[in-house]
A protein has these predicted regions:
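Short, flexible active-site loop motifs that bind/organize anionic cofactors or intermediates
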Residues: 17, 46, 53, 104, ...
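Short, solvent-exposed secondary-structure boundary motifs
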Residues: 22-25, 103-105
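Structural core segment of the AMP-binding/adenylate-forming
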Residues: 69-70, 97-135
Length: 135
């Protein structure tokens, strides 16, 4: 089967690659490699405060250890129902570090949607803010 018959839309894409190669690494391993190359560069900025890759990795590792202490292990699913904030990043990468699965849910989702995705994902626990607990 030719590329044009299996993916006919590609003829409209212009001069872009039709296939991308991805490294066989976890997202945590990729961030760790970036931190090793650029330890003093900002990994992110939140509300005017910059966090270096070194600081970011420290928070990720601390968060991963906290999950392990809670009994979260490789293969477990954990829902993160938080706004875009550093703690959500630390949780996402910390879970990836230990091999757990992050189930991201937008905190402004309707209560029924949150319930559906919690049940569907079989999450072992949920991380959220007190403002969203009532949902």
């Amino acid at each position: 089967m030719s590329l044009s018959s299996s993916a006919p839309w590609l003829k409209y894409y212009g001069n872009v690659p039709h296939h991308l190669s991805y490294p066989q690494k976890t997202i945590y391993q990729m961030v760790k490699a970036a931190a090793e190359r650029n330890p003093k560069l900002p990994a992110y900025e939140f509300m005017g405060k910059k966090t270096t890759f070194t600081q970011f990795m420290q928070k990720i590792d601390e968060t991963a250890q906290a999950f392990l202490a809670m009994g979260i292990k490789k293969g477990d699913r954990v829902t993160i129902c938080m706004p875009n904030c550093p703690q959500a990043l630390h949780a996402f990468y910390g879970l990836n570090r230990i091999g757990a699965v992050s189930n991201m849910i937008h905190p402004l989702s309707a209560a029924g949607e949150i319930r559906f995705y919690l049940n569907f994902s079989h999450s072992k626990c949920i991380l959220t803010l007190d403002q969203f607990y009532a949902k």
